[in-house]
């Protein structure tokens, strides 16, 4: 169906029920929003029926009521959009209006929009009691309720009267190869209390004025000259006489020997060409195609264009003959050329001449509007695509730096470096990562890191910290930057417990056992700011970064190594933390430092910190599973004797062989740690 119908539906629903209801209807009918009501687009019937069925389901009213309401709104919307004067000028009464609907449909289809509408046909009969019988024919079954809404609204708005419509008969008729629905309505006028002068629905009962003043004879040759396209024929369809154009086109046509069907092929209305059909549709517009007349063919690829005649049937001599008064059905100069016709072929009083010349300017405007609509559609699509790309850019920018910093950069504000007096840093890496890289394919390494880092990222978001960056197997987060907070140490320590637990779920591609990680935590001041223009990064600088990195590199696998300041800040925020005293550890560049291992958080279980459900066979708090070493392969080497800090001095029997200094350690492919910042220089690619 024509896109105007879909646009009318959209206007009806949005005005009465709101935009949200229409969007639900569009979604249910499986249209992409914005493509469901393109005026210049032709939708197939299945798409329109799908839209109407969705309206009935969402709004909750029967489909017949949907069609009837649409019929009434269609007249309202049509009059609002520039067709008001045309509709009011069509006829002096409702009967004449209904008889003119066929020609109006044909005009809209073939002149205004040039679409392939399969519109209905109408004919009206006046009954002796003043009621009207409206015959409605349509190749689309079930749409007759539209007629009820249309007729009632036309009577109310144009003729200031109220009518009642009832279906008298509904049947299926076979016309040629089509099955046509034929519905007969009885239209009765009722009194309108709000109208002072209601108009009659029919003027056929008015008195006839005698205009006879004598007989003025005109010869057949003069008549053929005055009306070059006319054809007169009898009820048996034998030609009686015809105009000069027809005679020139068909020189072998003979009076009372040639049938009209030998010369013309009925195009509109779509009914069998017979005397009975002409009688039924006498008030309709008739369009014929001249048979066997294919005119100018400009090149081998052009299709032959036939001439169409458009006019009306007039019964003369008390119905003994039918006079088809018509003119050539062309509306543009291009159509004239394609049919080898000229303006001079038409009578000077023929309004078709004016239509052709006016259409030259109108068509350029219609084409401009169509181009504008298509351009607007493309611009909307481009705007949507641009918005999607903008969101992707924003997401990428937020991956490179905190959201607050990214917002400032997008707004064009200068971002100066800021000093943070206290924050908590965490570093983690994978034990024997170099060996894993040497023995596995790059794909396995990337899969391993992706699995691990997705788990870490979830924990960072869960506890509201910030991931600074990942390089290779090194993962760095910070609490208290860029948003200052009092419990930054608690957040990071909780994340470290979750990281250690989550790492047990990631398997090494070599041993197929859980990987082992080291974690280091330290608190202190840092300076943070955006570095770079083309590839901006949010970086942290200061000795705190170096010490936090040393906590990780001097730690022990599957342990959370915490500095003195890290422990103090953690207990200040949450006294329920339990630390194991490691004792003095020599840190390159810092000398001896007293450090600790984080054992547990008595306030929260591991399952709470990881935001994972506990299975029935697992312990309530999960710390036995957190420190379970049996899941790893047995390894040699003396273990540290660790004492839980309980107010007494702890004996540190730490084996110096396990206290190897890792500051400035070599990474894969010869890369090394820069002891002055968190940046790890590596010739390998960065995996984020």
UniProtKB/Swiss-Prot annotation:
Name the needed cofactors: heme
Q: What class of enzyme is it?
A: lyase
- InterPro entries with a match to the protein in the record: A/G_cyclase, A/G_cyclase_CS, H-NOX_domain_sf, Heme_NO-bd, HNOB_dom_associated, HNOB_dom_associated_sf, NO_sig/Golgi_transp_ligand-bd, Nucleotide_cyclase
The answer, when asked if Protein biosynthesis is one of the entry's keywords, is: no
**Entries under PROSITE patterns matching the protein:** GUANYLATE_CYCLASE_1, GUANYLATE_CYCLASE_2
Query: What reaction does this catalyse?
Result: GTP = 3',5'-cyclic GMP + diphosphate
Record GO terms (molecular function): carbon monoxide binding; GTP binding; guanylate cyclase activity; heme binding; metal ion binding; nitric oxide binding; oxygen binding; oxygen sensor activity
Keyword Cytoplasm in the entry? The reply is yes
The biological process GO terms on file are:
aerotaxis; cGMP-mediated signaling; defense response to Gram-negative bacterium; response to hyperoxia; response to oxygen levels
> Domain Guanylate cyclase, which positions?
424-552
Activity regulation remarks: Regulated by molecular oxygen, which binds to the heme binding site. Probably not activated by nitric oxide (NO).
Q: Where in the cell is it found?
A: Cytoplasm; Cell projection, Dendrite
Q: In which tissues is it expressed?
A: Expressed in URX, AQR and PQR neurons. Also expressed in ALN, SDQ and BDU neurons, and variably in AVM, PLM and PLN neurons, pharyngeal and body wall muscles, and the excretory cell.
One Pfam family here: HNOBA
Low complexity compositional bias, start-end: 646-659
Q: What else is known?
A: There are two types of guanylate cyclases: soluble forms and membrane-associated receptor forms.
Known role: Plays a central role in social feeding behavior and oxygen sensation by synthesizing 3',5'-cyclic guanosine monophosphate (cGMP) from GTP. Oxygen, which binds to its heme-binding sites, probably regulates social behavior by modulating its activity. cGMP is a common second messenger in sensory transduction and is implicated in oxygen sensation. Indeed, C.elegans exhibits a strong behavioral preference for 5-12% oxygen, avoiding higher and lower oxygen levels; a higher level of oxygen inducing a naturally polymorphic social feeding behavior.
Assembly and binders: Heterodimer; heterodimerizes with gcy-36, and possibly with other soluble guanylate cyclases.
The molecule here is called Soluble guanylate cyclase gcy-35
